[in-house]
């Protein structure tokens, strides 16, 4: 049997312990799973509201992608992506680094150019960015790390009723304090770092895919957020080098089976060649 602690010393020890625990958790910090999820959702909603309120924006991202080649070998690809958005119906993105691609969406059609391969593809597209992003995923299985933040409501794209996880803690990057959030949903786990004060715009994300046969992990760093960029009108007009070959955008078989013939046969929008 241990020697009992004198009453006065015991009170002092308990007080010190309580104080240290309080400081470790921080005032008002979530302590339960439900509180952590609620805090995480609150921060995502705040970030979403900021982007929703911006009719135009531009951002540059650096991506480190862990991919699986058709041979089954692992490959790490590093990309830089510059994105320009004008809601509700204009989008442009250029990718450099391990690949060199451009995408234009002008409210009528979508044009994809693969510069390394010297080919381009076109397809008619719905009338809004939101519907076009949905169509790209459903028809072609295409999605990018920036896609969720381009939607009218990023929170609705990122969070579902099945989402678990939430607030992890606060971290410092340089002189900036960030809220670190981690979530899990069907087939995916993802983390995001958002400034605690100032504009709540994403600074970094890490996404891991459990069942994706092509991409296992994407680490994305955001920089140069601009919520009031000056965008030339021709930014959203596709231009393709004259010697590039046009190819078809192959849709998922299940979509083609259920698509009306007239929709599947719709001609692509016109494109200007340099």
Where are these regions (language model features)?
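Flexible, processing/modification-adjacent segments and terminal tails
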Residues: 30-31, 35-43, 71, 112-177, ...
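Secretory-pathway-linked proteins and extracytosolic
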Residues: 250, 255-264
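N-terminal mature ectodomain segment of secretory-pathway/periplasmic proteins
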Residues: 35-119, 182, 187
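Gly/Pro-enriched, hydrophobic low-complexity segments
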Residues: 62, 102, 111-113, 158-253
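Bacterial N-terminal signal peptides that target proteins for export
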Residues: 2-14
């Amino acid at each position: 049997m241990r020697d009992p602690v004198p009453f006065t010393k015991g009170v002092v020890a308990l007080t010190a312990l309580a104080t240290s625990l309080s400081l470790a958790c921080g005032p008002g910090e979530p302590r339960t799973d439900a509180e952590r999820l609620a805090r995480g959702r609150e921060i995502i909603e705040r970030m979403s509201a900021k982007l929703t309120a911006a009719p135009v924006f531009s951002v540059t991202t650096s991506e480190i992608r862990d991919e699986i080649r058709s041979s089954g070998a692992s490959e790490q690809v590093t990309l830089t992506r510059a994105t320009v958005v004008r809601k509700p119906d204009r989008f442009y993105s250029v990718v450099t680094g391990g690949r060199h691609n451009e995408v234009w969406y002008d409210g009528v059609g979508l044009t994809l150019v693969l510069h390394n391969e010297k080919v381009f593809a076109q397809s008619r597209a719905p009338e809004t960015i939101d519907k076009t992003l949905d169509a790209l995923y459903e028809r072609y299985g295409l999605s990018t790390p920036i896609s969720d933040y381009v939607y009218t409501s990023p929170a609705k794209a990122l969070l579902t009723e099945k989402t678990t996880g939430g607030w992890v803690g606060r971290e410092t990057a340089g002189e900036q304090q960030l809220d670190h959030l981690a979530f899990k949903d069907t087939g995916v786990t993802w983390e995001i770092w958002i400034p605690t004060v100032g504009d709540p715009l994403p600074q970094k994300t890490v996404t891991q895919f459990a069942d994706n046969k092509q991409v296992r992990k994407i680490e994305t760093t955001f920089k140069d957020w601009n919520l009031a960029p000056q965008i030339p009108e021709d930014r959203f007009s596709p231009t393709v080098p004259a010697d590039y070959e046009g190819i078809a955008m192959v849709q998922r078989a299940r979509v083609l089976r259920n698509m009306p013939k007239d929709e599947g046969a719709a001609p692509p929008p016109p494109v200007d060649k340099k």
